[in-house]
Regions:
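Viral virion structural and adsorption modules
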Residues: 1-46, 52, 56-119
């Protein structure tokens, strides 16, 4: 799974719109937060995920199985997110993370990205 999008929020390229950025979720961690310290608060599940960015799918694939850090694009606004995780859902953590990523990239009055699509 991966997505493509356009953005002007890359480090070192601020204000320059880069089209066809290829984003892939590299890792997902699901955490359960117990209500031990405060019994009135229910148990919470959170999903933490890291996003790796490349200039395009072609450039990502050309760099091999494990691309070097030098081949990646950087953006503090796009590289790490958290979301609520639903353990009762039929979808896996990666699917939930991708759905959340698409929503967060397009959200707000000044969205981080545009033309978001599955790759």
């Amino acid at each position: 799974m991966a997505i493509t999008f356009n953005t002007d929020r890359l480090q070192g390229l601020e204000g320059t719109t880069i089209t066809g950025v290829y984003g892939r979720i590299q890792s997902v961690t699901v955490k359960k937060y117990d209500a031990e310290t405060n019994p009135s608060v229910a148990v919470r599940w959170r999903c933490l995920y890291d996003v790796v960015l490349h200039a395009s799918a072609v450039k990502r694939n050309a760099s091999g199985e494990y691309p070097a850090w030098g081949n990646r694009l950087n953006s503090r606004e796009i590289d790490h997110f958290t979301c609520t995780y639903d353990p009762t859902s039929d979808s896996n953590p990666y699917a939930q993370a991708y759905a959340d990523l698409k929503t967060k990239l397009a959200a707000g009055g000044s969205p981080i990205a545009s033309s978001i699509a599955d790759a």
